[in-house]
Amino acid sequence: MQETLLSRAERSVPRLSAALNDYYQLTKPRIQVLLLITTAGAMWIAGKGHVEPLLLLVTLLGGTLAASSANAFNCLIDRDIDLLMERTRRRAIPAGRILPWQAALFATALGVASFAVLAAFANLFAALLAISGIGFYVVIYTLWLKRTTTQNIVIGGAAGAIPPLVGWAAVTGDLGWSAWVLFGIIFMWTPPHFWALAMMIREDYRKAGVPMLPVVAGDEATARQIFIYTLVLVPVTLVLYPLGTMGWIYLLAAGALGLWLIEGAFRLLKAPNDRKESRSLFKRSIFYLMLLFVAMGIDSIFLFA
């Protein structure tokens, strides 16, 4: 009897681990790193180089819960699309390992937890901004824009630009001009980033009937749009200097990083059908945003010392 119970327990451990991993993957953890970096960067700037460790911790926790909720809802709603795409058909919901009602309950619990954490330990404004981000991503982007227009990621990019607003509001309780510049940076960064990805997996989107720009307009038109958005993005990043929010260290870093990103977008413009170039720009855009916000943090240490 003892051996039977022990063997059952041993068999249940891998199943439990696999189930927990499925729920964890619903939150799309890999794409949350940049959200946390932008949130922390905004808090650091808003606090002029100083943020209470507890406030930083709870805001990042609340932001993680909000992003996890939005991503889980996205997986739930897009389960029909995911089933048709090679990249996503093995996800837990289309594969039947997590039932739709279970995913809905999980996503709702994460959203409620996010609001509770931010409202209790940061402030109500930050909590409401986080909830608005979930709502925008789920209702406006996932339910509406993604399946109806090539501009889905342009307008939907507003959802990904909300985390720095949450971070700023957590520190100050309001939103100044600089907070909206941070919003604008991510808003303008989003199309080049995601269109580069869409160029890499265009056939998957075509099979699923998702009207991403490369599917509808082709790679050449997409590469042109990427280049245009990149050219607009770089000057937006420099606005923080004349506002007095950032100093010369950031200005130099933003300028150098901007030229690096423009060079990558130009290479894609010259070879729009080369998947190596779209993959290169996709990766470059990730490091670009990460290093840009790191530069903000470093600059604020000296600027507000």
From Swiss-Prot:
Q: What is its main location?
A: membrane
* Signal peptide (UniProt feature, chain positions): none
Record field: catalytic activity:
heme b + (2E,6E)-farnesyl diphosphate + H2O = Fe(II)-heme o + diphosphate
Q: Which Gene Ontology terms of cellular component type are present? A: plasma membrane
Name a GO molecular-function annotation: protoheme IX farnesyltransferase activity
S-S pairs: none
Q: Which InterPro entries match?
A: Protohaem_IX_farnesylTrfase, UbiA_prenyltransferase, UbiA_prenylTrfase_CS, UbiA_sf
Location(s) in or outside the cell: Cell inner membrane
**Domain of life according to the entry:** Bacteria
Bilayer-spanning residue ranges:
31-51, 53-73, 98-118, 124-144, 153-173, 181-201, 221-241, 242-262, 285-305
Question: What membrane topology is given?
Answer: Multi-pass membrane protein
An annotated GO BP: heme O biosynthetic process
Annotated keywords: Cell inner membrane, Cell membrane, Heme biosynthesis, Membrane, Transferase, Transmembrane, Transmembrane helix
User: What pathway does this protein act in?
Assistant: Porphyrin-containing compound metabolism; heme O biosynthesis; heme O from protoheme: step 1/1
Q: What does the protein in this record do? A: Converts heme B (protoheme IX) to heme O by substitution of the vinyl group on carbon 2 of heme B porphyrin ring with a hydroxyethyl farnesyl side group.
Give the miscellaneous note: Carbon 2 of the heme B porphyrin ring is defined according to the Fischer nomenclature.
Family under the similarity heading: Belongs to the UbiA prenyltransferase family. Protoheme IX farnesyltransferase subfamily.
Query: What name has this protein been given in UniProt?
Result: Protoheme IX farnesyltransferase
- Which organism is the protein's source? Gloeobacter violaceus (strain ATCC 29082 / PCC 7421)
Q: What is the lineage of its organism?
A: Bacteria, Bacillati, Cyanobacteriota, Cyanophyceae, Gloeobacterales
What gene name is listed for this protein? ctaB
